[in-house]
Amino acid sequence: VTWDIQANTMGVKKSTELHISAVGLALEMIEEGDAICLGEVGRPHYQVSEHRWERANDMLLEIMRMASSSNVPIQLHVEDNGHQTCADLASLCDKAGLPRNRAVRHFASPDLTQENTSGLPVSVSMGKGSIERICSTIELSKSHWGMETDFLDDPKRPGAVLGPRTIPKRTNQLCQALKLMEWDDEKIERYILDVHENWISSTYF
């Protein structure tokens, strides 16, 4: 978003150079141990001109290459275009030499199918109806996933996103739903541990 706005005033070339420079600084911080992931990076999540869209993808590809060279995971802020979004991102990862399991799709839908994730780990927005969709696709999932609220502590925008209490609430709802699917307690416990801890370790460390 910032890149796109700046491109309107300083031009795409200068805006891109500025952002690539910022990514370089961020990667230095990660190397020094001040952070563990590069993000959010991505492309406009709203409609832009075809030329601007192509330049955004060019920049994202370069950022992925930089992350790959530094062996750093990235978190992606992108548009919601169904399964096509992750398919495009997976293709960019492959071109950049960045393992798909090191590119986390932020604010993803609760559709966990391989067709929808294309092998990318996803951070699922846990709004209403998310548990039902997760349970209906859970057996078709091959990617790691976690829960998120995209919590925004901004007094000027109350209710803009889900509050942090949503996660324990949804975790309990997921456990109850899995019991109804005849999962035993041990299997549920292992699965919840994967959702809240193990996938983070395997992705970011």
Predicted region positions:
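His/Asp/Glu-enriched short active-site or ligand-binding loop at hydrolase and phosphoryl-transfer sites
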Residues: 120-133, 151
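Mid-to-C-terminal alpha-helical segments outside catalytic/metal-binding sites
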Residues: 169-205
